[in-house]
């Protein structure tokens, strides 16, 4: 490969990279995704793969590394777990067809077809089936204490908001544990929320304040759901609308036009649930260990669920313990009914063991993609 900046290929690469400066660019070349320059250095170190030098630019060797297309998901998973965002650039035509053209027109047409980020994963190969994966956004209202969170699990379409306060923000973020957190640059720099955001610095995605505006958020929501009014979804604060709109805008950016399958948006409440600050959660080792193996957690000790959706629900229950006595008693009654009837419990576990991950299967069907395997799994229910 000639890496001279004047070649058509390098001009194409530079143009695509300029559009995604804060991401690694997987540039498709035949059976490999190639990375160049600083991207190559970062990826080679993160993936522990060979860093090579190929071609020159301005007399200097160009760093390069690559991963095979057929095994790309494995490498993407490792990069995402390290906190990278990756723009995947594909060949949009058969290279043999491109060769029939003359001159610079022989260059294979390429473009970024998806952006893979920690909070927008939908592929089974990249997700932990037994843990939620949230993209969240934080919005605040003026200089007061009011704030809001919105979060979406793109794989299942679960879309929620919560009106909260700056004071309670740390506890709510610890409960959600988002993979990515969108927030205005001014909010990130605000000393009043700095402590709450300190745990999530490596997951923050800074936005401009206007990207979390309530009016724009409401319009984006109406467009996404195909409605003229959001009244049927309930009542939302201005901050909730701004946060939810920012989540949708980020999804539209990363999915490159693919339509997400969204469940109805709803505003949540934390009434009846215990608020736990980050330090308390860590020390209790509810779902994450202080050190060592993941088996040293309360979740690992009590998880006997037979489905992925059940495991995610258990995480939800453990990270938001009930405080309402009536709700606790009702849960105890349900548990007692199953404990007393061993045969019903056995049959139920057998049925659940054969049940596919309905939430995420339906989420995939809701996106504008073909998923024959999802249809087949649902047909057996």
Model-derived segments and their meaning:
Residues 1-340, 357-363, 367:
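Basic, polar low-complexity surface loops/patches
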Residues 175, 346-352:
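Cytochrome P450
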Residues 300, 345-346:
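Active-site-adjacent structural elements in folded domains
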Residues 344, 367-370:
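Alpha-helical structural elements of signaling/regulatory helical domains
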Residues 370-381:
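Single conserved hydrophobic/aromatic residue that forms the stacking wall/gate
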């Amino acid at each position: 490969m000639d890496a001279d900046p004047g070649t058509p290929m390098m001009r194409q690469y530079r143009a695509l990279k300029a559009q995604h400066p804060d991401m690694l660019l997987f540039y498709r070349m035949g059976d490999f995704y190639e990375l160049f320059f600083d991207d190559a250095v970062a990826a080679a170190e993160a993936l522990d793969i060979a860093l090579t030098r190929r071609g020159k630019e301005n007399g200097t060797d160009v760093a390069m590394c690559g991963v095979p297309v057929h095994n790309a998901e494995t490498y993407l998973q490792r990069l995402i777990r390290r906190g990278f965002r990756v723009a995947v650039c594909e060949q949009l035509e058969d290279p043999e067809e491109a060769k029939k053209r003359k001159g610079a027109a022989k260059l294979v047409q390429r473009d970024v077809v998806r952006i893979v980020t920690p909070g927008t994963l939908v592929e089974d190969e990249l997700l932990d089936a037994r843990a939620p994966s949230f993209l969240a956004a934080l919005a605040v209202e003026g200089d007061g204490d009011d704030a809001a969170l919105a979060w979406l699990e793109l794989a299942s379409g679960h879309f929620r908001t919560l009106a909260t306060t700056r004071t309670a923000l740390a506890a709510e973020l610890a409960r959600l544990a988002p993979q990515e957190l969108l927030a205005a640059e001014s909010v990130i720099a605000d000393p009043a929320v700095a402590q709450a955001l300190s745990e999530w610095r490596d997951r923050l995605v800074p936005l401009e304040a206007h990207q979390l505006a309530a009016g724009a958020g409401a319009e984006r929501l109406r467009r996404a759901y195909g409605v003229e009014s959001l009244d049927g979804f309930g009542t939302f604060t201005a901050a909730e609308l701004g946060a939810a709109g920012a989540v949708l805008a980020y999804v539209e950016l990363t999915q490159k036009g693919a339509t997400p399958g969204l469940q109805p948006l709803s505003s949540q409440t934390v009434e009846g649930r215990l608020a736990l600050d980050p330090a308390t959660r860590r020390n209790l080792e509810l779902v994450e260990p202080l050190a060592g193996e993941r088996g040293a957690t309360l979740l690992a000790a009590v998880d006997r669920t037979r489905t992925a959706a059940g495991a995610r629900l258990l995480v939800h229950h453990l990270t938001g313990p009930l405080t309402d006595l009536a709700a606790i008693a009702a849960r105890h009654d349900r548990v007692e009914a199953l404990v007393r009837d061993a045969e019903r419990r056995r049959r139920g576990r057998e049925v659940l063991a054969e049940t596919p991950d309905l939430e995420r299967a339906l989420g995939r069907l809701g996106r504008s993609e073909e998923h024959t395997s999802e249809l087949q799994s649902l047909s057996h229910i």
